[in-house]
Amino acid sequence: LRAAKQIRKKLGQPATAAFVFAGGEFLAGLEEFCEILRVDGHIRDVAGCVAAGQIRDGEEFGGAEGFSLLAMTGGVSEPVGGDAAKVVPAGADGAVWIQSGIDPDFDARLADWDRRFPGVPLAGGVTGRARDGGPCVFLNGQRVEVVTIAAAGGLELVPSAAQGCRPIGEPLTVTRADSNILYSLGGQPAYRVLERAFESLSDAEKSHAKGNLFAGLAGNEYAEEFGSGDFLIKNIIGADPDSGAVVIGGLPRVGQTLQYQIRSRESALADLGRAFKPAAKAKKRAVAALLFSCVGRGENFFGVESPDASQLRSALGRKPVAGFFSAAEIAPVGGTTALHGYTAVAAVFAVKGGAVGSAK
Protein backbone atom coordinates (compact mmCIF):
# COMPACT_ATOMS: atom_id res chain seq x y z
CA LEU A 1 0.00 0.00 0.00
CA ARG A 2 2.84 2.39 0.84
CA ALA A 3 4.53 1.70 -2.50
CA ALA A 4 1.26 2.26 -4.37
CA LYS A 5 0.77 5.65 -2.74
CA GLN A 6 4.40 6.54 -3.34
CA ILE A 7 4.18 5.85 -7.06
CA ARG A 8 0.91 7.80 -7.31
CA LYS A 9 2.49 10.80 -5.60
CA LYS A 10 5.64 10.63 -7.70
CA LEU A 11 3.82 10.43 -11.02
CA GLY A 12 1.14 12.97 -10.21
CA GLN A 13 -1.25 11.31 -12.65
CA PRO A 14 -2.65 7.82 -13.37
CA ALA A 15 -0.18 5.31 -14.78
CA THR A 16 -0.78 3.42 -18.00
CA ALA A 17 1.07 0.32 -16.85
CA ALA A 18 3.49 -0.92 -14.24
CA PHE A 19 6.13 -3.63 -14.45
CA VAL A 20 6.31 -5.48 -11.14
CA PHE A 21 8.85 -8.15 -10.15
CA ALA A 22 8.12 -9.77 -6.80
CA GLY A 23 9.44 -12.33 -4.36
CA GLY A 24 7.79 -15.72 -3.94
CA GLU A 25 5.86 -14.61 -0.85
CA PHE A 26 3.52 -12.60 -3.11
CA LEU A 27 2.34 -15.56 -5.19
CA ALA A 28 -0.39 -16.75 -2.80
CA GLY A 29 -1.99 -13.30 -2.55
CA LEU A 30 -1.23 -12.19 -6.09
CA GLU A 31 -4.73 -11.03 -6.99
CA GLU A 32 -5.04 -8.84 -3.89
CA PHE A 33 -1.49 -7.50 -4.32
CA CYS A 34 -2.17 -6.36 -7.88
CA GLU A 35 -5.55 -4.92 -6.94
CA ILE A 36 -3.94 -2.72 -4.26
CA LEU A 37 -1.38 -1.45 -6.75
CA ARG A 38 -4.05 -0.74 -9.36
CA VAL A 39 -6.56 0.95 -7.06
CA ASP A 40 -4.31 2.81 -4.63
CA GLY A 41 -1.56 3.47 -7.15
CA HIS A 42 -3.94 4.56 -9.92
CA ILE A 43 -2.31 2.09 -12.32
CA ARG A 44 -4.40 0.74 -15.22
CA ASP A 45 -2.45 -2.49 -15.78
CA VAL A 46 0.03 -4.38 -13.61
CA ALA A 47 2.23 -6.96 -15.34
CA GLY A 48 5.31 -8.87 -14.24
CA CYS A 49 6.43 -12.03 -12.52
CA VAL A 50 7.54 -13.71 -9.34
CA ALA A 51 11.28 -14.39 -9.44
CA ALA A 52 14.35 -15.41 -7.43
CA GLY A 53 15.46 -11.83 -6.83
CA GLN A 54 14.75 -8.26 -7.79
CA ILE A 55 16.64 -5.34 -9.26
CA ARG A 56 15.79 -1.85 -8.03
CA ASP A 57 17.55 1.07 -9.65
CA GLY A 58 21.30 0.49 -9.11
CA GLU A 59 20.99 -2.44 -6.70
CA GLU A 60 20.49 -6.19 -7.02
CA PHE A 61 18.73 -8.25 -4.35
CA GLY A 62 19.26 -11.93 -5.05
CA GLY A 63 16.84 -14.23 -3.23
CA ALA A 64 15.35 -11.29 -1.35
CA GLU A 65 11.78 -10.64 -0.32
CA GLY A 66 9.96 -7.58 -1.57
CA PHE A 67 9.41 -6.30 -5.08
CA SER A 68 10.60 -3.78 -7.63
CA LEU A 69 8.18 -1.64 -9.60
CA LEU A 70 8.42 0.63 -12.62
CA ALA A 71 5.29 2.60 -13.58
CA MET A 72 4.79 4.52 -16.81
CA THR A 73 2.16 7.11 -17.71
CA GLY A 74 2.37 6.60 -21.45
CA GLY A 75 4.38 5.28 -24.35
CA VAL A 76 3.48 1.62 -23.88
CA SER A 77 0.68 -0.53 -25.23
CA GLU A 78 -1.92 -2.39 -23.23
CA PRO A 79 -0.21 -5.57 -21.93
CA VAL A 80 -1.21 -8.82 -23.61
CA GLY A 81 -1.15 -12.05 -21.62
CA GLY A 82 -1.88 -15.65 -22.48
CA ASP A 83 -0.26 -18.87 -23.58
CA ALA A 84 1.72 -17.18 -26.34
CA ALA A 85 2.79 -13.68 -27.31
CA LYS A 86 0.15 -11.95 -29.40
CA VAL A 87 0.40 -9.42 -32.20
CA VAL A 88 1.89 -6.09 -31.16
CA PRO A 89 0.24 -2.80 -32.18
CA ALA A 90 1.02 -1.35 -35.59
CA GLY A 91 3.89 1.10 -35.38
CA ALA A 92 5.38 -0.40 -32.22
CA ASP A 93 9.06 0.42 -31.70
CA GLY A 94 10.00 -2.59 -29.58
CA ALA A 95 8.49 -4.90 -27.00
CA VAL A 96 9.17 -6.59 -23.68
CA TRP A 97 8.46 -10.33 -23.38
CA ILE A 98 8.27 -12.05 -19.98
CA GLN A 99 7.66 -15.81 -19.87
CA SER A 100 7.38 -18.52 -17.23
CA GLY A 101 9.61 -21.48 -18.09
CA ILE A 102 11.29 -22.63 -21.30
CA ASP A 103 9.49 -24.99 -23.65
CA PRO A 104 10.69 -26.84 -26.81
CA ASP A 105 9.04 -24.29 -29.12
CA PHE A 106 10.69 -21.22 -27.58
CA ASP A 107 13.30 -20.68 -30.32
CA ALA A 108 10.66 -21.22 -33.01
CA ARG A 109 8.44 -18.53 -31.49
CA LEU A 110 11.32 -16.07 -31.39
CA ALA A 111 12.06 -16.82 -35.05
CA ASP A 112 8.37 -16.28 -35.79
CA TRP A 113 8.58 -12.90 -34.05
CA ASP A 114 11.40 -11.84 -36.36
CA ARG A 115 9.36 -12.91 -39.39
CA ARG A 116 6.15 -11.18 -38.30
CA PHE A 117 7.72 -8.03 -36.86
CA PRO A 118 10.96 -7.37 -38.76
CA GLY A 119 12.96 -4.56 -37.25
CA VAL A 120 10.94 -4.51 -34.00
CA PRO A 121 13.43 -5.26 -31.18
CA LEU A 122 12.36 -7.71 -28.50
CA ALA A 123 13.92 -7.94 -25.04
CA GLY A 124 12.89 -9.77 -21.91
CA GLY A 125 13.43 -12.50 -19.39
CA VAL A 126 12.28 -15.95 -18.37
CA THR A 127 11.35 -16.85 -14.83
CA GLY A 128 10.76 -20.32 -13.40
CA ARG A 129 7.62 -22.27 -12.57
CA ALA A 130 5.75 -22.19 -9.28
CA ARG A 131 5.76 -25.15 -6.89
CA ASP A 132 2.27 -26.02 -8.04
CA GLY A 133 3.56 -26.32 -11.60
CA GLY A 134 1.78 -23.19 -12.74
CA PRO A 135 3.27 -20.04 -14.25
CA CYS A 136 4.93 -17.27 -12.25
CA VAL A 137 4.08 -14.54 -14.76
CA PHE A 138 1.01 -12.43 -14.06
CA LEU A 139 -1.21 -9.77 -15.56
CA ASN A 140 -3.60 -7.85 -13.29
CA GLY A 141 -3.51 -10.58 -10.67
CA GLN A 142 -4.08 -13.49 -13.05
CA ARG A 143 -1.28 -15.98 -13.68
CA VAL A 144 -0.40 -16.38 -17.37
CA GLU A 145 2.35 -18.09 -19.36
CA VAL A 146 3.53 -14.99 -21.21
CA VAL A 147 3.00 -11.26 -21.04
CA THR A 148 4.05 -8.83 -23.76
CA ILE A 149 4.11 -5.04 -23.61
CA ALA A 150 5.04 -2.97 -26.64
CA ALA A 151 6.72 0.41 -26.81
CA ALA A 152 4.46 2.72 -28.79
CA GLY A 153 3.28 6.29 -29.10
CA GLY A 154 6.67 7.85 -29.73
CA LEU A 155 8.57 5.68 -27.26
CA GLU A 156 11.18 3.22 -28.51
CA LEU A 157 12.95 0.28 -26.93
CA VAL A 158 16.76 0.19 -26.99
CA PRO A 159 18.05 -3.30 -26.08
CA SER A 160 21.53 -4.22 -24.82
CA ALA A 161 22.97 -7.64 -23.93
CA ALA A 162 26.04 -8.46 -21.83
CA GLN A 163 27.01 -12.10 -22.36
CA GLY A 164 30.18 -12.29 -20.29
CA CYS A 165 32.10 -14.37 -22.82
CA ARG A 166 34.99 -13.75 -25.17
CA PRO A 167 35.82 -15.72 -28.33
CA ILE A 168 38.75 -18.17 -28.26
CA GLY A 169 40.38 -20.02 -31.11
CA GLU A 170 39.19 -18.97 -34.56
CA PRO A 171 35.79 -18.58 -36.23
CA LEU A 172 35.09 -21.47 -38.60
CA THR A 173 32.24 -22.55 -40.82
CA VAL A 174 30.06 -25.45 -39.72
CA THR A 175 30.67 -28.14 -42.33
CA ARG A 176 28.77 -31.04 -40.76
CA ALA A 177 26.05 -31.04 -38.12
CA ASP A 178 22.98 -33.05 -37.22
CA SER A 179 20.43 -31.45 -34.92
CA ASN A 180 22.48 -30.22 -31.93
CA ILE A 181 25.46 -32.47 -32.68
CA LEU A 182 28.40 -30.65 -34.21
CA TYR A 183 30.70 -32.94 -36.20
CA SER A 184 33.06 -30.69 -38.14
CA LEU A 185 34.17 -27.08 -38.41
CA GLY A 186 36.06 -25.97 -41.48
CA GLY A 187 36.38 -29.64 -42.43
CA GLN A 188 38.05 -30.49 -39.10
CA PRO A 189 36.60 -32.52 -36.22
CA ALA A 190 34.70 -30.16 -33.92
CA TYR A 191 36.36 -31.70 -30.86
CA ARG A 192 39.83 -31.10 -32.30
CA VAL A 193 38.98 -27.44 -32.90
CA LEU A 194 37.78 -27.22 -29.30
CA GLU A 195 41.06 -28.76 -28.10
CA ARG A 196 43.09 -26.18 -30.00
CA ALA A 197 40.98 -23.35 -28.62
CA PHE A 198 41.57 -24.67 -25.10
CA GLU A 199 45.32 -24.92 -25.67
CA SER A 200 45.39 -21.25 -26.69
CA LEU A 201 44.32 -20.23 -23.17
CA SER A 202 46.66 -19.07 -20.45
CA ASP A 203 47.34 -21.41 -17.53
CA ALA A 204 45.08 -19.32 -15.31
CA GLU A 205 42.23 -19.53 -17.82
CA LYS A 206 42.70 -23.27 -18.26
CA SER A 207 42.42 -23.80 -14.52
CA HIS A 208 38.84 -22.52 -14.41
CA ALA A 209 37.73 -23.47 -17.93
CA LYS A 210 35.72 -26.49 -16.78
CA GLY A 211 32.07 -25.55 -17.03
CA ASN A 212 32.94 -22.19 -18.59
CA LEU A 213 33.47 -23.16 -22.23
CA PHE A 214 30.69 -22.44 -24.70
CA ALA A 215 29.90 -22.49 -28.40
CA GLY A 216 29.14 -19.19 -30.11
CA LEU A 217 26.92 -19.16 -33.19
CA ALA A 218 27.37 -16.02 -35.29
CA GLY A 219 24.33 -13.76 -35.17
CA ASN A 220 25.24 -12.03 -38.43
CA GLU A 221 26.85 -14.13 -41.15
CA TYR A 222 27.85 -11.06 -43.13
CA ALA A 223 30.17 -9.55 -40.52
CA GLU A 224 33.79 -9.27 -41.66
CA GLU A 225 35.12 -9.70 -38.13
CA PHE A 226 33.69 -11.27 -35.00
CA GLY A 227 34.15 -10.22 -31.40
CA SER A 228 32.38 -10.28 -28.04
CA GLY A 229 28.66 -9.69 -28.45
CA ASP A 230 28.49 -11.01 -32.02
CA PHE A 231 27.51 -14.55 -31.06
CA LEU A 232 24.56 -16.49 -29.72
CA ILE A 233 26.13 -18.26 -26.74
CA LYS A 234 25.17 -21.93 -26.36
CA ASN A 235 26.14 -24.47 -23.71
CA ILE A 236 28.51 -27.30 -24.55
CA ILE A 237 26.59 -30.32 -23.31
CA GLY A 238 29.13 -33.02 -24.13
CA ALA A 239 31.97 -34.10 -26.39
CA ASP A 240 33.34 -37.36 -27.81
CA PRO A 241 37.08 -37.43 -28.60
CA ASP A 242 36.71 -40.66 -30.59
CA SER A 243 34.11 -39.41 -33.06
CA GLY A 244 35.23 -35.79 -32.84
CA ALA A 245 31.68 -34.65 -32.12
CA VAL A 246 30.61 -31.85 -29.78
CA VAL A 247 27.03 -31.59 -28.50
CA ILE A 248 25.75 -28.06 -27.89
CA GLY A 249 22.57 -26.49 -26.57
CA GLY A 250 21.58 -25.09 -29.94
CA LEU A 251 20.95 -26.07 -33.54
CA PRO A 252 23.97 -25.20 -35.70
CA ARG A 253 23.39 -24.95 -39.44
CA VAL A 254 25.82 -26.06 -42.11
CA GLY A 255 27.39 -22.88 -43.46
CA GLN A 256 26.97 -20.99 -40.19
CA THR A 257 30.00 -19.50 -38.45
CA LEU A 258 30.88 -20.87 -35.02
CA GLN A 259 33.58 -19.90 -32.56
CA TYR A 260 34.19 -21.34 -29.12
CA GLN A 261 33.95 -18.99 -26.14
CA ILE A 262 35.18 -18.78 -22.56
CA ARG A 263 33.32 -17.21 -19.68
CA SER A 264 35.32 -15.64 -16.89
CA ARG A 265 34.96 -12.88 -14.35
CA GLU A 266 37.46 -10.76 -16.26
CA SER A 267 35.78 -11.23 -19.64
CA ALA A 268 32.37 -10.57 -18.11
CA LEU A 269 33.52 -7.31 -16.50
CA ALA A 270 35.06 -6.17 -19.77
CA ASP A 271 31.91 -7.14 -21.65
CA LEU A 272 29.70 -5.05 -19.37
CA GLY A 273 31.37 -1.84 -20.49
CA ARG A 274 30.92 -2.78 -24.15
CA ALA A 275 27.42 -4.17 -23.86
CA PHE A 276 25.70 -1.17 -22.31
CA LYS A 277 27.07 1.36 -24.81
CA PRO A 278 23.70 1.48 -26.66
CA ALA A 279 22.08 2.37 -23.34
CA ALA A 280 24.66 5.09 -22.70
CA LYS A 281 24.09 6.55 -26.18
CA ALA A 282 20.36 6.75 -25.44
CA LYS A 283 20.92 8.41 -22.05
CA LYS A 284 19.62 11.85 -23.00
CA ARG A 285 16.41 10.37 -24.42
CA ALA A 286 16.00 7.58 -21.87
CA VAL A 287 13.30 7.78 -19.23
CA ALA A 288 13.51 4.31 -17.66
CA ALA A 289 14.79 0.79 -18.15
CA LEU A 290 14.19 -2.84 -17.31
CA LEU A 291 17.05 -5.20 -16.49
CA PHE A 292 16.95 -8.99 -16.76
CA SER A 293 20.04 -10.56 -15.19
CA CYS A 294 20.79 -14.29 -15.14
CA VAL A 295 20.80 -15.93 -11.72
CA GLY A 296 24.28 -17.24 -12.61
CA ARG A 297 25.69 -13.71 -12.62
CA GLY A 298 25.46 -11.29 -9.71
CA GLU A 299 27.81 -10.90 -6.77
CA ASN A 300 28.62 -14.62 -6.49
CA PHE A 301 30.15 -14.62 -9.97
CA PHE A 302 31.63 -11.12 -10.23
CA GLY A 303 32.82 -10.76 -6.64
CA VAL A 304 31.35 -7.25 -6.42
CA GLU A 305 27.90 -6.03 -5.37
CA SER A 306 25.21 -5.33 -7.98
CA PRO A 307 27.52 -5.57 -11.01
CA ASP A 308 24.91 -5.40 -13.77
CA ALA A 309 22.62 -2.88 -12.09
CA SER A 310 25.46 -0.55 -11.14
CA GLN A 311 26.91 -0.67 -14.66
CA LEU A 312 23.53 0.19 -16.15
CA ARG A 313 23.21 3.06 -13.68
CA SER A 314 26.61 4.33 -14.83
CA ALA A 315 25.31 4.26 -18.40
CA LEU A 316 21.92 5.87 -17.74
CA GLY A 317 22.46 8.03 -14.69
CA ARG A 318 19.69 8.08 -12.10
CA LYS A 319 16.92 6.95 -14.43
CA PRO A 320 14.53 4.47 -12.75
CA VAL A 321 15.28 0.79 -13.33
CA ALA A 322 13.38 -2.34 -12.31
CA GLY A 323 14.14 -5.96 -13.07
CA PHE A 324 14.61 -9.49 -11.83
CA PHE A 325 17.03 -12.41 -11.73
CA SER A 326 16.08 -14.61 -14.66
CA ALA A 327 16.47 -18.22 -15.75
CA ALA A 328 17.11 -17.11 -19.34
CA GLU A 329 17.14 -13.85 -21.24
CA ILE A 330 15.79 -12.59 -24.58
CA ALA A 331 17.59 -10.07 -26.79
CA PRO A 332 18.61 -9.56 -30.41
CA VAL A 333 22.13 -10.36 -31.60
CA GLY A 334 23.10 -9.42 -35.13
CA GLY A 335 19.48 -8.78 -36.02
CA THR A 336 18.28 -12.17 -34.74
CA THR A 337 16.16 -12.41 -31.60
CA ALA A 338 17.52 -15.19 -29.42
CA LEU A 339 17.26 -16.89 -26.06
CA HIS A 340 20.39 -16.39 -23.95
CA GLY A 341 21.93 -17.76 -20.78
CA TYR A 342 24.36 -16.19 -18.28
CA THR A 343 23.42 -12.83 -19.81
CA ALA A 344 22.25 -9.43 -18.59
CA VAL A 345 19.72 -7.78 -20.90
CA ALA A 346 18.76 -4.13 -20.55
CA ALA A 347 15.62 -2.75 -22.20
CA VAL A 348 15.84 1.03 -22.23
CA PHE A 349 12.74 3.09 -22.91
CA ALA A 350 13.76 6.18 -24.87
CA VAL A 351 10.97 8.61 -25.68
CA LYS A 352 10.36 12.07 -27.06
CA GLY A 353 8.01 12.83 -24.17
CA GLY A 354 6.26 11.10 -21.27
CA ALA A 355 6.68 10.49 -17.58
CA VAL A 356 7.79 7.57 -15.50
CA GLY A 357 8.38 6.79 -11.87
CA SER A 358 9.67 3.95 -9.74
CA ALA A 359 8.88 2.71 -6.26
CA LYS A 360 10.57 0.15 -4.05
Where are these regions (language model features)?
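Small-residue-enriched flexible segments
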Residues: 1-40, 44, 49-302, 306-319, ...
